[in-house]
Amino acid sequence: MSDRRLQLDVRVVGAGLLGTSIGLALSEKGVDVSLDDLSPTAVRLAVDYGAGRPATADDRPGLVIVAVPPDVTARTVAHELAAHPDALVTDVASVKAGILRELRVLGADVRRYLGTHPMAGRERGGPISARADLFLGRPWVIAGHDGISYSRAGAIEDLILDLGAVPVEMTVDEHDASVAMISHVPQLVSTIMAARLAAATDGAVGLAGQGVRDVTRIAGSDPGLWVQILAANADPVAAILKRVRDDVDSAIEALEHPDAPGSRRTIADLMGAGNAGVARIPGKHGSTRRYAQLVVMIDDTPGQLARLLTEIGELGVNMEDLRLEHSPGAQVGFAEVSVVPEAEAPLIAALTGRGWRIAGAS
């Protein structure tokens, strides 16, 4: 049994990706986790994977975690507050202000409710995709409100810390505005770009490289879930999209008249603003430090990537990030390795000396 902070029995409502992942992580800590879901099959799967046990009518949880779709979160939280009058209830939905408003309309006892949101997930859902380490090192927002005391809410922070996540305190409105910017609008932009590929020629799609893969990576997300999320956070998302639209309109105007005075500067300014924005995204350990990249060509045969990573370690270089790319039909792959700038030149020299081919290196 692992050391843990949380000293309460936990009830998880919703045996999907997040609920099952929470159950897996808490069960590994020795917490008694009971699982409930409208789908008996989902509960059985989650139990089989080790996320807890089926809930019973005799359970007296101290903490209830609601992990259901956003459009039924408030009603489910209200039901759990009524059914377990001694329990603290939280949810992990990706929007917060609307849920709190609905709970107040329903007359729920929000003195025992505190909404949270783990900034973690996967493109695929369901209990079979769950992982006990899903939350490690990830921000987990605690969306506070005036109706609950911090002493009562302490168990929420214990839960987050036990799951290896990093607690971040925000108001419900701050949370919704923040996730509109860093999650909801990027999802829409990725989806809109990917939709253009449906009408692209086979020849164009065959040229797909890492750029289009990066932009469209999250476009395979569940449409039904995202309709709920976007509808629940519509105003902040629409406000940001209007500013994106203004930028796109400026780019269109400049490209339609590329020789007009100021057109090239408009494009350059947009690109520069993008550089400034991406530089603000925290990297490893929350640092905004920029890294150097070198692209290593790897034969598409078993064991080559493992050999490269082993040799980088033997050279005493700490790899900050890694991205892989394959070209259709090619028998070679490309590993883009990120390192601190001062390590770039020595690493290129050392890998070249060991027979590795570095793209762009002479």
Range-by-range predicted roles:
Residues T76-P127:
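Rossmann-like NAD(P)(H) cofactor-binding subdomain of soluble oxidoreductases
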Residues L6-D9, P61, D86, G137:
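Phosphate-coordination loops involved in phosphoryl transfer and adenosine-cofactor binding
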Residues M1-A55, L63:
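NAD(P)+-binding Rossmann beta1-loop-alpha1 motif at the extreme N-terminus of oxidoreductases
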Residues G277-S362:
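A conserved regulatory-domain signal marking ACT and ACT-like small-molecule sensing domains
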Residues G203-G274:
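Interdomain hinge/lid region at the active-site interface
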Residues V64-I65, T90:
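N-terminal Rossmann-like NAD(P) cofactor-binding module of classical short-chain dehydrogenase/reductase
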Residues L134-G220:
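Internal alpha-helical scaffold of NAD(P)-dependent oxidoreductase catalytic cores
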Residues L38, V68, V92-S94:
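Short beta->alpha hinge that forms the Motif I/post-I loop of the SAM-binding pocket
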